[in-house]
Amino acid sequence: MPVSRYAVFGHPVAHSLSPAIHADFGKQTGIALDYTAIDASLEDFSAALQRFADEGGKGANVTLPLKEAAYALASSLSDRARLAGAVNTLVRNDGQWQGDNTDGAGLVRDLTERQGLDLRGRRVLLLGAGGAARGVAPALLEAGITAMVVVNRSPERADALCDALGEPARVTSRYIEDLRELGDFELIVNATAAGRDRDAGAFALPLGLVNSLTAAVDLNYGDTAIAFLAWARAAQCRYAIDGLGMLVEQAAESFALWHGVRPDTDPVYAALRAREAVLISAD
């Protein structure tokens, strides 16, 4: 029986843990699969995705900066992908790509089940308004947060995200210059890629954003999350959480869409954390 082909598309994508995660899921469930990382720029993504389909690709994950492009290329969309305006999971069906977004479900599952946070009634600051932010915002609203403030370097994108969410009573956008005037938040989510250049100054955020309950969450993991989490710890946030748990949970959601079974994420998450600890101690 031929092995089904899957991939993660991004730019850059060599650092992605998704191939290792899905390999572990396959072993756990007894499903044979070939999952690779494919680097594609925005300009090359459409052609690269078509080549992948022509070569028998059955499904794909999509990461930065391609999530909104994947949304545009999908022939059909799930409700959560349509609401997000971004796609992180593609399923090949009858010669067409179906788009979904598992980011929000992955984040909420990690925060509520693994980290033990109660999101109900919480005030949330969302940094960023691109594909990553769009993917998680609807799920945070569904989880029962009381208010969300979206801040982005481009205020037009923040406004567009707020309009798309369609909940003006709960969701507002503010200028980045207004951060000192926003009060405090129980949840601060970094959905930007500002940490990629490892500039600690990228997150010189006002300490007034933090209260005694604040959880600071970076949707990135590894080196890209270092700067934001360093700020969170210096600001004495109660929790400083990277995106590794979300990554594993959204991957499990994607795996279930492709294969009809949801794998156990705990052993995969634990193995990745252990590997991370070994890498840090080896530095």
Curated annotation (Swiss-Prot):
Signal peptide: none annotated. Keywords: Amino-acid biosynthesis, Aromatic amino acid biosynthesis, NADP, Oxidoreductase. It is an enzyme of class 1 (oxidoreductase). GO terms for biological process: amino acid biosynthetic process; aromatic amino acid family biosynthetic process; chorismate biosynthetic process; shikimate metabolic process. It catalyses: shikimate + NADP(+) = 3-dehydroshikimate + NADPH + H(+). It comes from the Bacteria. The keyword NADP applies. The active site is at K67 (proton acceptor). GO terms for molecular function: NADP binding; shikimate 3-dehydrogenase (NADP+) activity. Its EC number is 1.1.1.25. NADP(+) binds at D79, G128, A129, G130, G131, A132, G243. Pathway: Metabolic intermediate biosynthesis; chorismate biosynthesis; chorismate from D-erythrose 4-phosphate and phosphoenolpyruvate: step 4/7. Shikimate binds at S16, L17, S18, T63, N88, D103. GO terms for cellular component: cytosol. Pfam families: SDH_C (PF18317), Shikimate_DH (PF01488), Shikimate_dh_N (PF08501). Involved in the biosynthesis of the chorismate, which leads to the biosynthesis of aromatic amino acids. Catalyzes the reversible NADPH linked reduction of 3-dehydroshikimate (DHSA) to yield shikimate (SA). PANTHER family: BIFUNCTIONAL 3-DEHYDROQUINATE DEHYDRATASE_SHIKIMATE DEHYDROGENASE, CHLOROPLASTIC (PTHR21089:SF1), SHIKIMATE DEHYDROGENASE (PTHR21089). Belongs to the shikimate dehydrogenase family. Homodimer. This is Shikimate dehydrogenase (NADP(+)). The lineage of its organism: Bacteria, Pseudomonadati, Pseudomonadota, Gammaproteobacteria, Lysobacterales. The gene is aroE.
